Amino acid sequence: MSGIIATYLIHDDSHNLEKKAEQIALGLTIGSWTHLPHLLQEQLKQHKGNVIHVEELAEHEHTNSYLRKKVKRGIIKIEYPLLNFSPDLPAILTTTFGKLSLDGEVKLIDLTFSDELKKHFPGPKFGIDGIRNLLQVHDRPLLMSIFKGMIGRNIGYLKTQLRDQAIGGVDIVKDDEILFENALTPLTKRIVSGKEVLQSVYETYGHKTLYAVNLTGRTFDLKENAKRAVQAGADILLFNVFSYGLDVLQSLAEDDEIPVPIMAHPAVSGAYSASKLYGVSSPLLLGKLLRYAGADFSLFPSPYGSVALEKEEALAISKYLTEDDAFFKKSFSVPSAGIHPGFVPFIVRDFGKDVVINAGGGIHGHPNGAQGGGKAFRAAIDATLQNKPLHEVDDINLHSALQIWGNPSHEVKL
């Protein structure tokens, strides 16, 4: 294979999956085949999409009810020749799912890139090992927290929040994805002030914390804004990838003048991936494609919290981010939304040690503030790695957190 193989979930009311698959393969490549003269067929053969797999699935009554008709469901795979498209994500996505996405009854499940095609994508600049080296933390999951309630607040408020989270033992603090350029907390001022706070905490407590600042602005201003952030001392760039496009992420990741990790936020991605019947699968969108395009971290809904993904999907995202690949470094999985210390054993059991535990309210809502919230999470992480039940841990901050949010992992064994 020198091109790309697309895997689709299709629904067909004519009950002929093979015919529908062939129609898709032709419609997204040469348009027609049987009515072409033999000589023209020979000329176009190398450009034709080829159906390589058709698998019928069991009938699903909920699907029939939703679509208001009886359909045959199936998984199909089509190989698209590399000759047909330039080696970039806009061309690949348009080839494999462009007008097909308008069908409303087809879901793009996966894209399998040939080795030749993979060479055109950067992958993470730092990856898991590189991030761990920045923090000098190699033996446990990382802990991340989020600035909360920053809109309308000044730099002083930001510095106080940042200091408390860092003292609490948080490894990474990220901006809220809805904090954009503004007069009270402009980009470079956030970075400079944040570094002063984090350096002070490091000198006093010996704990290193990185700050992920939100990269925003018009698309053609992003590189300039990113370089300003780097010059000001930015540790990590948070980026709302799907508000801009995967190719924009790749452009940032490939730029040698932006030598910092990039954290991909999933904002807007639900518009592409939420349906079980159409769109793009979450594992492909938030896992494989983000990694290929250069994200060092991928945030996605956890299976446990307030905006939950099905566990199978969340684990598939993580698999794509972390599986061995000779072409790409591994990206950090960041299962998010509604996470509190009682979920830590679940997260470690399901995602392993190479994960970022991301909390907002679970840190800021602690009765001892963000310092107490961070310490509660760190105690939960340490106990989990020792296979010690959380309720047996002699830590006042963790005990308080479990009283507030509960301990659903009471029976979890690693």
Swiss-Prot record:
Cofactor notes: Binds 1 Mg(2+) ion per subunit.
GO molecular function term, any single one: ribulose-bisphosphate carboxylase activity
Pfam hit, one: RuBisCO_large
Active site annotation, chain numbering: K99
Keyword rRNA-binding: no
GO BP of this protein: carbon fixation; L-methionine salvage from methylthioadenosine
Gene3D superfamilies: Ribulose bisphosphate carboxylase, large subunit, C-terminal domain, RuBisCO large subunit, N-terminal domain
Annotated keywords: Amino-acid biosynthesis, Isomerase, Magnesium, Metal-binding, Methionine biosynthesis
UniProt miscellaneous comment: Has no RuBP-carboxylation activity.
Assembly with partners or alone: Homodimer.
Name of the featured protein: 2,3-diketo-5-methylthiopentyl-1-phosphate enolase
Gene: mtnW
